[in-house]
Structures are given as structure tokens and as C-alpha cells.
Regions:
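C-terminal flanking tails of non-heme Fe-dependent oxygenases
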Residues: 1-117
């Protein structure tokens, strides 16, 4: 696996025996007001041994309102995202992916990746 760093370079995520890597997505950015950001990543096997990549996506129930957690915003740190249901969020990502042929990202995440080059 590789992740794209803030300079726009792909860096390896070396496998560590007995562990696994968890990628967080856009919902963590919304919940934490960008305290925890998703990383652009890709799965590559550059090793001579087999490597297993098992994507597993978890979303809240569709009617659940996704919004910044109370502990992640305040008077000098307003929420960066408008509240929306989980279904609205996922639908917007799927629609964007269909329009562009690229993975769906929130607008803020897409701009961050674009700025990195």
C-alpha cells in the first residue's frame, strides 16, 4: 500500500507482521472538523510475498445525520461541513464518481489532494 503525502508524493506503507492498516474516510473529517483527514491511497504489492488487501466499508444508517462532533468545534472553530444524512453523503460521492470516473471525495478533500499536486 502507498499513501500520498502532503507534497503529492507516493510513499510506501510497509507491512508489519501481525497488524493491519485502517484507512479512515471522509466521515472522520466531517465528524472531527478535519482533525482526522482521509489519505489518498493505492494498493500495490511490491514485495515478493503475497499480500492481502481486503476493503471493508462501514457507514452509519442512511437516516443518521452526519455532522461535526460537539467536542470538535467551538466559537473560534466553527464546523467546516454542513450536516447531512449518511445517505446524502454516500449518494453525493457515488454521483461524483460516476460523473468523473474517479473515486468520490468531499469537495474539501478533493481540493486538499489537488493542492498537493
Amino acid at each position: 500500500m502507498q499513501v500520498r503525502n502532503s507534497a503529492g508524493l507516493w510513499i510506501d506503507v510497509p507491512p508489519v507482521p501481525g497488524t493491519f492498516v485502517v484507512n479512515i474516510g471522509d466521515l472522520f473529517a466531517i465528524w472531527t472538523n478535519d482533525l482526522y483527514l482521509p489519505s489518498l491511497h493505492r494498493a500495490l504489492n511490491l514485495a515478493t510475498v503475497p499480500r492481502i488487501s481486503s476493503p471493508f466499508f462501514v457507514y452509519p444508517q442512511g437516516t443518521t445525520v452526519v455532522e461535526c462532533l460537539e467536542t470538535c468545534h467551538g466559537p473560534n472553530n466553527p464546523p467546516l461541513y454542513e450536516p447531512r444524512t449518511a445517505e446524502e453523503h454516500v449518494t453525493s460521492l457515488v454521483d461524483q464518481s460516476r460523473r468523473t470516473g474517479r473515486p468520490g471525495l468531499t469537495t474539501r478533500t478533493a481540493r486538499r489532494f489537488q493542492a498537493a499536486g
